[in-house]
Design a protein with these regions (language model features):
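Helical (often loop-to-helix) elements that flank the catalytic cores of nucleotide-handling enzymes
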Residues: 42-49, 194, 200-201, 227-239
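Intrinsically disordered, low-complexity segments enriched in Gly and acidic/Ser/Thr residues
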Residues: 176-230
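Short, flexible beta-strand-to-coil junctions
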Residues: 26, 35-39, 129-130, 210-215, ...
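Charged, alpha-helical interface segments at or near domain boundaries
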Residues: 11, 15, 25, 29-184
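Short, non-transmembrane alpha-helical segments in secretory-pathway proteins
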Residues: 2-17
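C-terminal structured domains
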Residues: 222-266
Length: 266
């Protein structure tokens, strides 16, 4: 027996009884707008259901629990935190950067603080409240008389204070480092030059970076063609598994800047 979108919606409604669900057609698929206490979230439930596979098991049940928790905690964050009441010192202390795909929030109707990063990714600024975070819009910067770039500087400073944790795997002469501090900002460490340069000193010009979803960053020391094939397969796997997928495109780092690097696997 396989999962259905209705089954997952029921799980969410158990936690958010007054939730309203609106369906919107985009191309040949359906996107759902969830509305809870005047806050909204857009989700692609059908893509998530496909990731679960055709059989129910403990692993897929865990993925559903994580998915529901992610949605519920985000709505609770929208309700709890009023950015209109923030003071400048509090904002500076708790602001962090996160990275999203350029397809995320394309129209930016909420006027979120959004900065360019790469052809595949954009940077957003969020207010962290320990159990989650809330995206910041430009009302905050206008209200507190601070520029997007200045606030981004403080956000990067807070990111750099986080501990660096990672696992290392070696396969056929290639080394793979998986960042896993599990603090909600592992993917965002692609913005931390200190982290990138720490690994660059180890790796040098064979430095590849992967950002398949928000909760991981893959740094690879690639020595041969097989290493590239492994990296691409890992990227696709992680992208499919992530709650907030970002990109399957890999980046190369030269000690100064990131450049998109397309890996073609035969």
């Amino acid at each position: 027996m396989s999962y259905t979108r209705d089954y997952i919606f029921e799980k969410i409604i158990e936690k958010l009884p007054t939730l309203k669900i609106h369906e919107k057609k985009e191309d040949d698929s359906s996107i759902f707008i969830l509305e809870y206490k005047n806050n909204k979230a857009k989700i692609d439930i059908d893509s998530f259901v496909k990731k679960l596979g055709n059989k129910k098991n403990s692993l897929s049940d865990k993925k559903i629990d994580e998915f529901v928790y992610y949605i519920v905690s985000n709505f609770e964050a929208q309700e709890k935190i009023s950015t209109s009441n923030l003071n400048k010192d509090d904002l500076i202390e708790h602001v962090f950067p996160v990275v999203r795909s350029t397809s995320f929030n394309k129209e930016n109707k909420q006027n979120l603080i959004k900065l360019n990063h790469t052809n595949e990714t954009d940077i957003y600024l969020v207010y962290d409240f320990k159990n989650g975070y809330k995206f910041l819009d430009r009302k905050v910067t206008e209200q507190l008389l601070i520029s997007d770039e200045e606030l981004f500087g403080f956000a990067k400073g807070n990111l750099e204070k986080l501990s660096l944790k990672y696992n290392k795997d070696s396969v056929q002469g290639n080394d793979f480092y998986f960042l896993n501090a599990k603090d909600g900002y592992d993917g965002a460490r692609i913005l931390d030059e200190k982290v990138l340069n720490y690994f660059y000193e180890k790796i040098g010009l064979d430095f590849y970076v992967g950002l398949p979803h928000q909760d991981t960053l893959i740094i690879a020391d690639i020595k041969n063609k097989k290493g590239l094939e492994i990296l691409q397969k890992v990227m696709v796997h992680f992208f499919a598994e992530g709650l907030v997928p970002i990109t399957t495109i890999t980046f190369k780092y030269d000690g100064n800047k990131l450049e998109s690097y397309f890996i073609f696997v035969e």
